[in-house]
A protein has these predicted regions:
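Solvent-exposed beta-strand/loop surfaces of large extracellular or lumenal domains
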Residues: 491-516, 531-538
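Low-complexity, Ser/Thr/Pro/Gly-enriched N-terminal "stalk/linker" regions
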Residues: 1-84, 103, 107-130, 166
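A conserved hydrophobic secondary-structure block that centers on an alpha-helix together
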Residues: 132-212
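Carbohydrate-binding/catalytic loop surfaces
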Residues: 37-77, 125-144, 193-209, 236-255, ...
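Structural helix-adjacent loops and short alpha-helical linkers that scaffold large soluble proteins
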Residues: 5-8, 12-15, 95-107, 156-173, ...
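C-terminal beta-rich recognition modules with glycine/proline-rich loops and embedded aromatic residues
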Residues: 272, 337-345, 350-443, 449-467, ...
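Active-site neighborhood of glycoside hydrolase catalytic domains
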Residues: 178, 195-234, 240-302, 306-333
Length: 623
């Protein structure tokens, strides 16, 4: 089974929280100037310098100064300088259809990189000299040069494939010649020593490049970048994750996933599945769906002592990408559930809703605060995955599943898929903001009319305990095929209508199966939600709360013990501030029956407040 997603050009977000966050990210991307993005590459190529009063670019002189430069990890003195440009290009490749400005800037950046490569001799393209890799090969220290190079090469690859920029592929192919020549004389042991220093997703780049070119030199790079010391022990069942750098390993496994897709060799897939078992099913995740604390994997089944600095944003984003690989291979609902949880309680929770900035970590302990990055003074690795994370979800709702369609996410959006029988199938997912709750705030004509016009149907008296979505499926040619709708694990009940008529719900492997003729049909699905307590695996007396897929944060800066039965979470938390103007507020609650009250809001809405996610709960009566 191989699921096929809509291309970025055939996916458009509808109004709502995700579109708001998408546009916030787009605004941040456009604020980063080409001059700053290119500076480390032009400097290395001898095409830029600064003497204290002005910048000098060969062929032109421009006013410049440190006050306008990028700093933090992008500082001219940082060995990780230049990483953000690669992330930017990867994001831009998926956004050029949504923003002509982004597309034009991306093409300009690629052209300038080609100029830098030519100035470097025709192959080397990097924001630092070749000796950084020579130091790694000699067993000396340099701060992850291949990590940075991966970001650039992946950005060029994405520009070639999704951005349709042929010059990007030319730059990448010439760069591959340098790596082929550099690694050719090395023994397997020497290669393994180099791969022990963070390489990012270089394996994924080489696999994708081999697919594009069919060049055996690129196939050889795939084999050279196979990190046997890690992969073979994974296959043997050894725990090679606990207390290891999580994002290093995830990026390498993404390379295995791509190598499997390109070569068809099942041994690559075996590595991916062994990793998923160790990282997720056999280890457990936090209530958010995320993993890692302080950038390293927490021990299997142990979380209570590691509620600080949880789920590095890079790990969230890259694990979502890995879940997407596995979902496309298998169609299994569990991978879609993982993806959904990490989107809502990771990607959204770690992006400031007003500034668009990223939080490196998402602490879950008592009295936590989110630490937000600065637009130009930090440039953590997570600034880069921030740019890319918000390009993942526009096309997430539906996939082509052979001769069927599989709807795995209820992302407000319009998608177009090329169906073998029905031609172009347009799928529109729209939340019902009057009779259901959806994450975020939703201004809509329907919501406005429901409070303004007395002759239109009213809204429920109280906040509904459900999410409702209307899915319009419109086929160019009427055809008989199967549509599958995922039933989330958090849904306590599900009802479905087709063209207004109720149907018997049959759930098979986590999906409702609708096998019928399709032309222009309306499917309404209602997913019942409830407040649920989730205990820590190693301290079951501490629980976190969710409302459907939404993790709740209690706005309190100290540890407070809640009195009551966690099995009856609805008795502990009561609806609060449930309605605002023309929409229902999702995930807003207050405690009930406690000496001192606590207000709860969605974790993704927390900005500067102190908050707590995991609370001790005692059945002892309130004193």
């Amino acid at each position: 089974m191989t699921l096929v997603a809509a291309t970025p050009a055939n996916a458009e977000l509808g109004p709502g929280l995700l579109k708001d966050r998408f546009e916030r990210n787009l605004t941040y991307m456009t604020s980063l100037t080409p001059e700053n993005l290119l500076r480390p590459y032009q400097f290395e190529a001898g095409l830029w310098s600064w003497c204290g009063t002005a910048g000098t670019t060969i062929g032109a002189t421009v006013a410049d100064g440190p006050d306008t430069w990028h700093w933090g990890w992008e500082a001219p003195t940082s060995q990780l300088r230049g990483h953000i440009l690669g992330h930017w290009l990867s994001a831009a490749a998926h956004l050029r259809h949504a923003s002509p400005r982004i597309g034009a800037t991306a093409d300009h950046l690629v052209a300038e990189l080609a100029r830098c490569q030519q100035a470097n001799g025709g192959e080397w393209i990097a924001p630092f000299p070749e000796k950084h890799l020579e130091r790694i090969a000699a067993g000396q220290t340099a701060w992850a040069p291949q990590y940075v190079l991966h970001k650039l090469l992946a950005g060029l690859l994405d520009m070639a494939v999704s951005g349709h920029n042929t010059q990007a592929l030319e730059i990448l192919t010439r760069a591959a010649k340098w790596f082929s020549r550099w690694t050719a004389p090395m023994s397997r042991e020497q290669l393994d020593d180099i791969l022990d220093v963070e390489t990012g997703g270089m394996l994924e780049v080489w696999a994708s490049l081999f697919q594009l070119t069919g060049d055996l030199e690129h196939q050889e790079l795939v084999l050279r970048y196979r990190r046997g010391r890690f992969f073979d022990r994974l296959l043997a069942g050894d725990d090679v994750l606990t207390n290891k750098h999580a994002n290093t390993q995830v990026a390498e496994i993404l390379g295995c996933a791509r190598a499997y897709e390109v070569t068809g060799d099942p041994r690559w897939r075996d590595i991916v599945e062994a990793f998923w078992h160790q990282a997720v099913t056999g280890r457990g995740t936090y209530v958010t769906g995320g993993s890692s604390s302080g950038e390293i994997w927490q021990p299997p089944g142990e979380q209570a002592a590691r509620l600080h600095d949880v789920q590095e944003h890079c790990v969230v984003t890259n694990m979502m990408r890995l879940a997407d690989y596995l979902y496309r291979w298998t169609g299994e609902a569990g991978y879609a559930a993982y993806w959904e949880s990490n989107l809502i309680n990771g990607v959204l929770a770690q992006q400031h809703p007003e500034t668009g900035m990223v939080a490196y970590f998402l602490p879950l302990e008592a009295g936590s605060t989110k630490v937000w990055g600065h637009p130009t003074r930090d440039f953590w690795c997570c600034h880069g995955t921030l740019l890319q994370a918000h390009t993942l979800y526009p096309a997430s709702a539906a996939h082509l599943d052979g001769q069927g369609i599989r709807i795995g996410q209820y992302t407000p959006s319009t998608l177009r898929l090329d169906h073998p029988l029905a031609g172009t199938v347009e799928i529109e997912v729209t939340p019902d903001v009057r009779h259901g709750v959806v994450p975020g705030r939703h201004h809509s004509i329907e919501g406005y009319e429901s409070i303004q016009l007395v002759h239109t149907p009213g809204v429920p008296w109280r906040r509904p305990r459900s999410m409702t979505f209307r899915i319009r499926i419109c086929c160019a040619v009427p055809a008989l095929f199967t549509v599958r709708l995922r039933v989330p694990q958090w849904a306590s009940a599900t009802t479905v209508t087709v063209n207004g008529g109720s149907i018997d719900v049959e759930v098979v492997n986590g999906f409702i199966v609708l096998d019928r003729a399709w032309s222009d049909e309306l499917v309404d699905i209602t997913l019942a939600t409830e407040v649920t307590a989730h205990p820590l695996p190693d301290e079951p007396g501490h629980v976190a709360f969710t409302d459907g897929p939404i993790v709740l944060a209690g706005l309190v800066g100290e540890e407070r013990t809640l009195r009551g039965d966690p099995a009856d979470a609805a008795a502990l938390l009561r609806p609060d501030r449930e309605r605002h103007h023309s929409w229902w507020n999702a995930g807003t609650y207050r405690t009930h029956g406690q000496n001192r009250g606590i207000r709860f809001i969605p974790l993704y809405d927390v900005t500067q407040q102190e908050y707590t996610v995991y609370f001790p709960v005692s059945s002892a009566p309130t004193e």
